[in-house]
């Protein structure tokens, strides 16, 4: 390589210093240059072709202030204010840069290597700590000329275009690198600048009234703007009308589905009318949780999920297709879930709307007013929206099946609750013309369906199935108006509860009646007591004859239509024991028993109205035709309640005459006597005995003849014969026959057993012999005329034989009194025995066998459930799936509930299962009763089979006792008051032991029983906190584990506290039971304090622990709220 080549390579390797191109020298901008550039703005505008040649003074000042503030406040970010810096630089370049700016540029060229792309602080400037602290150091920006020129040109064009069209809002900074959203609120410096210029908030508020433009006000809305507004309103009305029509079509489709439902929901499917027969499987029928009706499980219902309001958990529920569609239409698709009310809708047909406005005179509006177009609708065309107006302007049209007593209220009466179509009660005036739902939860679908019930439901082919107990009222105790209201309200309530409207009452002549027809009762002309009493007596006469004619044809007194009377026996999947049967010939029921709960014990399932087919073989007892003394006295002392229906006195007297003489003797029915004082409500046992003997003898001799239906009725007033001899007899019989003939003695008591049947029969036989001998002496030896059978009706003592005084005052002639021969003692004894046995039916519900043992040392009640026999068949396959529940009454039923296992498909289950109650003290043993309930487990809910009760005070300590008891109907359960709940917080079992070798106190937390449920589910998540006070160490505090969802937790945990033995008498052991909660403080259930100064068992246990170290001392303590 030559020397010249090497020299060339060396020159190439040497790094040449970078030089700034001469064509585009960098420009340094300082605060001084920016101030000088502001004076040359007019020159820049002229050179760039401004049409006006110069800008206004205000716009110059605005631009200069903005650029100066931008360069001063943010010197370290030249890119964000590039537009402002470029504008100032361009103005300086075109008009001639100032002397300071050129000098600064030369200074930057000579020696500064750090001036590129970075702000510089001039070294010639004095420090801020000098004589002038307010002066800030000079800041320089190095910008390229092409970038400055481009941004200047764009910004200048924007300013010039603003003179001809849309104005540009400089306060939004979108031209200078800010956001392009024109609705962004300006910053504080922009507002401050506009306040100085008095230009308003923004450019768009320039036309508003202000101190500077108060005279330049624009006019009103133009015609074009008004037309545009009207188009928008018309479009909104059109969309609203379409939405109303859409909801109306869905509601109409739902109503058509309800009309096509022809089944009764009990023995037949509600939708397809398929009968649930004995050959069909039980799974084919399922009950809807909303309407409580049975439908086919496969084709007529759907399973869906729902949130339980009490537990908050998602559960699987079964709905019929009607209720499922109602949920979709009335809650989801209609938008009611959002508005919390049912919106307005239009029906597609021309029928009357659901809610029709009522004028002041009570008539419907005429067709012209109903056809008035809606205001705001274009042209007024289209159907009227059928709104649901508020209660202030319109009255809700109630269905025909609603009772008259609730028709005046805005809502329907549901189950005796508040008058409202909503579940929680009141119907609020929403102002939107709709039904407002409660905001807390979704309303019941049945309540919404009833709230929008149409007017033509009487045409529905759905039959009416009404239980007999609905109309079991004493007819004579009501006036004309009260009876009609009560009857209609009872009929309406039974079907409001099920969500199915009932038909209008068909007052037709019964099919089985062959006697003379009754004429309609004339309406009362006045409201005086005399006229009301006369109308009452007339109607009662008609009612007694009609009821006597169809006694064995139907049990419904209001409706005898063929479609409401079942043609076959009930094969319902749910056969109710406690509910009286609605089968046509099943009228034999014991009314002497107390009123039983006719609904399910477990799940609140409404039982069916049909009883078991096995009950059809029972004979008709006379107790269903005879008033009972204790039932009436119970009604009298209770002061309220509707008494049960009793037999007619004319039929009873005629039966007495038939059974005695063997001939058909007709006695006139007594009229209704005037209402007497409550003192006349009691009758002697002789009257009850005479009625039982006479009616029972008639039943035993096969006398099914209908007496008093076709014979002429005599209108004679009867009075009770007051004879001293008979009063003496009554006083004697009260002490002799009250126990033998009382309804509770005749029926199975709660401590009766099948082994006691022989004793009861012997006792009844002895009572019958004494009564017959007394009756024989009375009828043959006494001088006074014989006493006729006395009937008691709603507290009125009515005799079937008139006295001579009343007869002479009315007819002035003596009426011949037929003599009644004495019934032989043997026949009467058999009749009364059969009557009492059929009335009480001691084995009709079966029996149960179990043993009980009370261990006094451990405070434990041990139960051994053995078996049950002859239970009722509640399933369609002829069997039941029985299980047993135990409760301790009175007390918290949920805390004391014990449940046995379920034996499937049997009527004679064998359990052989042992269960125990802990913490049963001597006080509990004397006060509490063990309730034993037998239930049939089903897919949804449970059916009641029977129950019995055992008093714990009958048990001996540490001795096993066997019970074989008859099952009875459901008895009322006493409810705890708030005071009792606060007192009874539960019990805890604690063991104490002091170990001298370790110097520690051991506390055993064994278990708690009968705790109070603190959560919304009725349960608690309990745990214990234990502390030894006064606290000298952190180790003297401890707590147990948490037991989830229980009221009887069992811990069996041991806690250890190190404490000297000599300090124990001064210490106090504090134990508290708490309910664990998430997200809030734990609830305090109760606690105890153990110390030497404590009372009762608490002090004794602590003293025993101190006196006997090394010995475990256990005791039960009752928790207190204020411990």
UniProtKB/Swiss-Prot annotation:
GO terms for molecular function: small GTPase binding; zinc ion binding. Residues 531-541, 756-768 have a biased composition (Basic and acidic residues). Its cofactor is Ca(2+). Pfam families: C2, FYVE_2. It is found in: Synapse. Zn(2+) 2 binds at residues 288, 291, 320, 323. Keywords: Calcium, Exocytosis, Metal-binding, Repeat, Synapse, Zinc, Zinc-finger. Residues 365-375, 387-400, 410-428, 487-497, 605-632, 649-666 have a biased composition (Polar residues). Residues 215-341 form the RabBD domain. InterPro entries: C2_dom (IPR000008), C2_domain_sf (IPR035892), FYVE_2 (IPR041282), FYVE_RBF-1 (IPR030541), Rab_BD (IPR010911), Rabphilin/DOC2/Noc2 (IPR043566), Rabphilin_Doc2_C2A (IPR047022), Synaptotagmin (IPR001565). The keyword RNA-binding does not apply. Zn(2+) 1 binds at residues 269, 272, 296, 300. Residues 1-17 have a biased composition (Basic residues). GO terms for cellular component: membrane; synapse; synaptic vesicle. Residues 844-967, 984-1103 form the C2 domain. The keyword Zinc-finger applies. Rab-3 effector. This is Rabphilin-1.
């Amino acid at each position: 390589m030559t020397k010249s080549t090497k020299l060339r390579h060396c020159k190439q390797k040497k790094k040449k210093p970078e030089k700034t191109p001469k064509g585009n020298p960098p420009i340094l901008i300082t605060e001084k240059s920016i101030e000088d550039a502001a004076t040359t703005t007019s020159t820049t505008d002229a050179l760039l072709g401004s049409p006006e040649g110069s800008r206004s003074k205000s716009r110059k000042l605005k631009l200069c202030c903005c650029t100066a503030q931008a360069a001063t406040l943010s010197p370290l970010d030249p890119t964000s204010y590039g537009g402002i810096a470029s504008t100032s630089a361009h103005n300086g370049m075109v008009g001639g840069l100032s002397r300071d700016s050129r000098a600064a540029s030369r200074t930057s060229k000579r020696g500064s290597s750090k001036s590129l792309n970075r702000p510089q602080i001039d070294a010639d400037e004095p420090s801020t700590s000098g004589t002038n602290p307010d002066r800030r150091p000079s800041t320089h920006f190095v910008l390229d000329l092409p970038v400055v020129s481009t941004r200047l040109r764009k910004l200048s064009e924007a300013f010039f275009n603003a003179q001809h069209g849309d104005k540009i809002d400089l306060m939004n900074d979108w031209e200078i690198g800010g956001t392009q959203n024109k609705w962004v609120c300006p910053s504080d410096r922009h507002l401050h600048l506009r306040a100085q210029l008095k230009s308003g908030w923004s450019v768009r508020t320039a036309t508003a009234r202000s101190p500077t433009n108060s005279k330049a006000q624009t006019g009103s809305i133009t015609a074009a703007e008004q037309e545009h507004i009207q188009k928008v309103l018309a479009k909104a009305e059109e969309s609203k009308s379409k939405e109303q029509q859409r909801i109306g079509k869905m509601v109409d489709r739902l109503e058509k589905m309800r009309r096509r439902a022809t089944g009764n929901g009990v023995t037949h499917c509600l939708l397809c009318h398929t009968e649930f027969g004995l050959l069909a499987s039980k799974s084919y029928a399922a009950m809807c949780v909303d309407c409580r009706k049975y439908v086919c499980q496969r084709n007529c219902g759907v399973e869906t999920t729902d949130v339980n309001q009490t537990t908050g958990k998602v559960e699987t529920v079964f709905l019929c297709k009607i209720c499922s569609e109602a949920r979709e239409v009335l809650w989801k698709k209609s938008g009611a879930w959002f508005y919390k009310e049912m919106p307005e809708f239009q029906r597609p047909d021309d029928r009357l709307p659901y809610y029709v406005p009522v004028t002041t005179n009570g008539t419907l509006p005429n067709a012209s007013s109903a056809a008035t177009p809606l205001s705001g609708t274009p042209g007024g065309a289209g159907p009227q929206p059928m709104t649901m107006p508020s209660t202030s302007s319109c009255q809700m049209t109630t269905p025909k099946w609603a009772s008259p007593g609730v028709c005046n209220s805005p809502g329907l009466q549901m189950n005796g609750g508040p008058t409202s179509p909503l579940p929680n009660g009141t119907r609020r005036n929403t102002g939107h013309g709709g039904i407002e739902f409660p905001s807390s939860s979704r309303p019941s679908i049945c309540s919404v369906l009833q709230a929008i019930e149409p007017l033509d439901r009487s045409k529905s082919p759905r039959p009416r199935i009404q239980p007999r107990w609905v109309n079991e009222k004493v007819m004579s105790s009501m006036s004309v108006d009260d009876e009609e209201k009560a009857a209609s309200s009872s009929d309406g309530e039974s079907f409001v509860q099920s969500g199915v409207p009932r038909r209008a009452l068909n007052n037709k002549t019964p099919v089985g009646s062959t006697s003379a027809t009754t004429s309609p009762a004339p309406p009362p002309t006045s409201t005086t007591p005399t006229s009301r009493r006369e109308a009452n007596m007339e109607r009662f006469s008609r009612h007694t004859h009609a009821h006597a004619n169809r006694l064995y044809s139907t049990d419904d007194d209001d409706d005898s239509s063929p479609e409401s009377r079942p043609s076959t026996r009930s094969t319902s999947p749910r056969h109710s024991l406690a509910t009286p049967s609605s089968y046509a010939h099943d009228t034999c029921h014991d009314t002497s028993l107390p009123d039983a709960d006719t609904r399910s014990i477990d799940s609140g399932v409404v039982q069916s109205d049909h009883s078991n087919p096995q009950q059809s073989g029972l004979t008709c007892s006379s107790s269903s035709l005879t008033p009972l003394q204790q039932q009436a006295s119970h009604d009298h002392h209770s002061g309220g309640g509707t008494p049960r229906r009793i037999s007619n006195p004319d039929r009873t007297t005629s039966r007495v005459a038939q059974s005695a003489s063997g001939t058909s003797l007709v006695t006139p029915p007594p009229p209704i006597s005037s209402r007497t004082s409550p003192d006349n409500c009691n009758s002697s046992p002789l009257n009850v005995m005479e009625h039982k003997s006479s009616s029972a003898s008639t039943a035993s001799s096969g006398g099914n003849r209908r007496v008093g239906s076709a014979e002429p009725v005599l209108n004679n007033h009867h009075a009770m014969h007051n004879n001293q001899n008979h009063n003496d007899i009554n006083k004697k019989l009260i002490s002799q026959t009250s126990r033998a003939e009382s309804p509770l003695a005749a029926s199975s008591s709660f401590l009766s057993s099948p082994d006691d049947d022989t004793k009861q029969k012997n006792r009844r036989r002895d009572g019958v012999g004494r009564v017959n001998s007394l009756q024989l002496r009375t009828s043959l030896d006494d001088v006074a005329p014989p006493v006729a059978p006395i009937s008691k009706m709603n507290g009125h003592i009515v005799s079937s034989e008139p006295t001579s005084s009343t007869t002479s005052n009315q007819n002035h002639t003596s009426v011949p009194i037929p003599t009644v021969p004495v019934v032989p003692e043997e026949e009467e004894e058999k009749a009364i025995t059969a009557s009492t046995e059929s009335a009480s039916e001691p084995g009709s519900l079966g029996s149960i066998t179990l043993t009980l043992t009370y261990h006094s040392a451990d405070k434990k009640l041990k139960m051994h459930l053995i078996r049950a026999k002859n239970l009722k068949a509640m399933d369609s396959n002829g069997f039941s799936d029985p299980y047993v529940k135990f409760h301790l009454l009175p007390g918290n039923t949920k805390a004391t509930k014990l449940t046995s296992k379920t034996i499937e498909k049997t009527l004679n289950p064998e359990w052989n299962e042992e269960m125990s109650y802990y913490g049963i003290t001597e006080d509990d043993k004397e006060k509490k009763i063990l309730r034993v309930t037998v239930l049939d487990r089903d897919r949804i809910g449970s059916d009641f089979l029977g129950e019995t009760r055992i008093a714990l005070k009958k048990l001996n300590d540490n001795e096993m006792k066997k019970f074989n008891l008859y099952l009875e109907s459901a008895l009322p359960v006493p409810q705890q008051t708030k005071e009792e709940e606060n007192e009874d917080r539960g019990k805890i079992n604690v063991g104490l032991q002091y170990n001298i070798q370790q110097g520690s106190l051991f506390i055993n937390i064994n278990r708690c029983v009968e705790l109070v449920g603190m959560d919304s589910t009725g349960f608690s998540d309990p745990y214990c906190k234990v502390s030894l006070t006064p606290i000298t160490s952190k180790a003297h505090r401890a707590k147990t584990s948490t037991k989830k969802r229980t009221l009887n937790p069992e811990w069996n945990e041991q806690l250890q506290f190190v404490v000297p033995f000599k300090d124990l008498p001064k210490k106090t052991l504090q134990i508290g039971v708490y309910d664990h909660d998430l997200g809030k403080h734990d609830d305090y259930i109760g606690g105890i304090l153990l110390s030497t100064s404590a009372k009762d068992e608490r002090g004794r246990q602590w003293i025993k622990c101190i006196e006997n170290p090394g010995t475990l001392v256990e005791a039960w303590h009752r928790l207190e709220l204020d411990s």
